[in-house]
Amino acid sequence: MSSPTMMPMSLTEIAQAVDGRLMPTTVPTDEPVAISAFTDSRQIVPGSVFVAIAGERVDGHDFVPKVGAQGAVAALVDHEIAGAQVPQIVVENTVKALGALAKHNIERRRALESLFTVIGITGSVGKTTTKDLLKSLLSKMGDTVAPVGSFNNEIGLPLTSLKVNAGTRFLVAEMGANHVGEIANLTSLVPPDIAVVLKVGVAHLGEFGSAERIAQAKSEIVRGLVPGGLTILNANDEHVAAMSAIAPADVLWFGLPQKEDAQLDTTALDVRCDDLDHPSFVLEDKTGRHANVTLGICGQHNVMNALAAATVAMTLGMPIDAVASGLSDVTSISPHRMAVSTVTKPETSFTLIDDSFNANPDSMKAGLDGLSRWHAGAEQQPFRIAVLGAMLELGPDEHRLHEDVGRYAVEGGADALVTVGSTSDEALDALAEAMAQGGKAVAADPTMVQWAHDAEQADRMVTRLATDHEGTVVLLKGSHASGLSALAERWTQN
């Protein structure tokens, strides 16, 4: 049997935890045979519980008959699957049952005497990078569980929480939301001991309706703290700072110095970026202790993410020198986040800055700032191309916001702008057109602003531009629906 990733449980215990009905079976039901849980049947190993979820394209129930042969000890289902050679626990809703199982697993871990701390992270931007930095730091202090990529919703968070076992010291829980109430639901499953709020931006503005509603949603992580839990807030964001009023206990502040009277627990002084857009700064705590940091990842915006991670790590006992060296050691984070590589094609080659995981106006501008800083001090300046996909869920101002980003790209130093829409989605295509119009309005040479109807066309446009201009650097940034992350993978695999 594989090594346990969750607290070992019997089938009877699981059925009780998820309020399910254990179908008659010949296998022992009171022995702790379950040691892991998955929703992807391809990940099943001996000792796994398979949670069958009906998705938009695939229904996990179709795979229940196969998982027994892979070693699954049980399947959570919303209806009995006839003929399946695996014990079945029937529940009303398998997504909710997954959450209930995760909640039970965390409660089992908390019941042990050994130390265990849950750190919850939310914000409109920066969650995954902060999670990656914090996991790297905390792993030096004890066994740390954190999601792969951005598993931060009602499925991803429980799956991550089901990797917690008796040896786990820290759980870093990324919590995302598209609607008010989602983070409250996540904290009801996994209440954090420490809540970190990074930023309230305009991501998902169309779903929420206003920045105030976004702030309300993000504040649910503070309300969901365990009694006496610690709140860590970005002092430079007024919506985030206002959450101190609902904090149940102590509040710690991180941010850049802006006012002499600001009481910052963690700050960055003398922030600079080199020609490869790697930030360096002096990390300082509230006692005046300081240490030099040079981030191994790109983007000045990541200074704030590093400060958030540093605040947590120092609060949990890591010395500032160890934090600084730990931050400097991180050279790679989750895919498609300011990842730099060289793309070689038969016709040409260019440098790629792949930030294609997702996009909103704030992260777009941060990525464009990084592009403008790329070899900014070089005698021979690179030819900078911004390849930008449409942004989703921005509400009634979406066209104006796209025009603003197009204008920002050109005014910020992009030599060429390629906006990417969709041949199958007229709304997405119209947003890409609006971005191109914003760029053309301020471009010295409007022919350097091009509108692509899909990633394939964008590929051809970039190839032509890079062939004509030596020393090309390309920023790739857009919402997942624009298909740019797939383009990045094709480029880098080639």
Region spans (language model):
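Residue-level signal for inorganic ion chemistry
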Residues: 14, 48, 67, 101, ...
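ATP-dependent carboxylate-amine ligase
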Residues: 1-19, 46-49, 59, 132, ...
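Short, basic phosphate-binding NTP loop
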Residues: 2-122, 129-140, 337, 428, ...
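Short, polar loop motifs at secondary-structure junctions
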Residues: 75-82, 235-239, 256-258, 422, ...
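Short, conserved loop/helix-junction motifs that constitute active-site signature segments
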Residues: 69, 189-190, 222-227, 245-247, ...
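A short helix->loop->beta-strand "cap" motif at the edges of active sites that frequently abuts
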Residues: 70-73, 86, 225-230, 247-250, ...
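Extended acidic/charged loop-beta regions that coordinate divalent cations
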Residues: 27, 164, 175-205, 241-290, ...
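Phosphate-binding loop of NTP-binding sites
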Residues: 15, 97-235, 239-247, 468, ...
